[in-house]
Amino acid sequence: MDRSLNLLDLALGFDEQLAIPSPLNGKVILIEDCVETSGSFVLHQLMKRVLSSNSSDALIFLAFARPFSHYDRILRKLGCNLATHKSNNRLVFFDMLMVKCSDGDQMEDNVSAVAKLFREIQETVRKLQSVTSGNITVMVDDMSLLEIATTGSNSDHVLDFLHYCHTLSSESNCSLVILNHEDIYASMERPAFLLQMVCLADVVIKAEPLASGLANDVHGQLTVLNKGISNSGRGSSRNKLQNFQFRIKENGIDYFYPGCRS
């Protein structure tokens, strides 16, 4: 096994040869987490992979949760300089912290705001495709905050946005990575867009606390459902479910199977 690959890489379909194109091209990756166990570190790891110096890939990042400085600080610890990638046009950062859609009596304004955001993403994809031969990834951190921004109208706007982005990923062979906080809907009926995200996702990554409770040297577990693992070049595919644990360090993540941490 290539020592640069970890258990998450392998679960996502990367192999020892680091095949080009990426196995995530044209796919939807959904990261689900909860209050007890944040899945943000998975997003950061995928950001680093997209912006690797060994590739020409580009990243469009929609930040509903944190300012640019937050991601830049974390990625620097992982050896990735977001400011440099931004100036080199490999990273296009949408600061969505101030986005607030209108109240329910102005539904047309909400529809226009969501449609405008998608058109900006679509145009950015076109511009990037004209200057790079690499894959383009669209990341959303996080979808639940977009849903909160449209509260007062209805979550259909989020569902529309999701379908827009899914169509874009299919037509332009882009990757779509979405972080969503699953447990905020625990006390209510799950909205349609949440069910649709799970349905559309080619890969579902779920970050959860340990079933056995807290541990000093293990911070949680990941369950990765990959719906599109190819079957040795035979033209068929199969679902692959993997479960492993992780430990978050200052400058990286350790992944290991239960009971196998050295």
UniProtKB/Swiss-Prot annotation:
| Cysteine disulfide links | none
Q: Where in the cell is it found?
A: Cytoplasm; Nucleus
The terms describing its cellular component in GO are: cytoplasm; elongator holoenzyme complex; nucleus
Disruption outcome: Narrow leaves and reduced root growth that results from a decreased cell division rate. Higher resistance to oxidative stress mediated by methyl viologen (MV) that blocks electron transport during photosynthesis and by CsCl in light. Accumulates anthocyanins.
- Keyword set for this entry? Cytoplasm, Nucleus, tRNA processing
Q: Which domain of life is it from?
A: Eukaryota
GO BP term, example:
root morphogenesis
Q: In which pathway does it act?
A: tRNA modification; 5-methoxycarbonylmethyl-2-thiouridine-tRNA biosynthesis
* Matches recorded under Pfam families: ELP6
Tissue expression per record: Expressed in leaves, stems, roots, flowers, siliques and guard cells.
Q: tRNA-binding among the record's keywords? A: no
Q: Where does this protein chiefly localize?
A: cytoplasm
By sequence similarity, the record places it as follows: Belongs to the ELP6 family.
Function, in words: Component of the elongator complex which is required for multiple tRNA modifications, including mcm5U (5-methoxycarbonylmethyl uridine), mcm5s2U (5-methoxycarbonylmethyl-2-thiouridine), and ncm5U (5-carbamoylmethyl uridine). The elongator complex catalyzes formation of carboxymethyluridine in the wobble base at position 34 in tRNAs. Promotes organ development by modulating cell division rate. Involved in oxidative stress signaling. Prevents anthocyanins accumulation.
Task: Describe its assembly.
Answer: Component of the elongator complex which consists of ELP1/ELO2, ELP2, ELP3/ELO3, ELP4/ELO1, ELP5, and ELP6. Interacts directly with ELP4.
Name the UniProt record assigns to this protein: Elongator complex protein 6
Q: Which organism is it from?
A: Arabidopsis thaliana
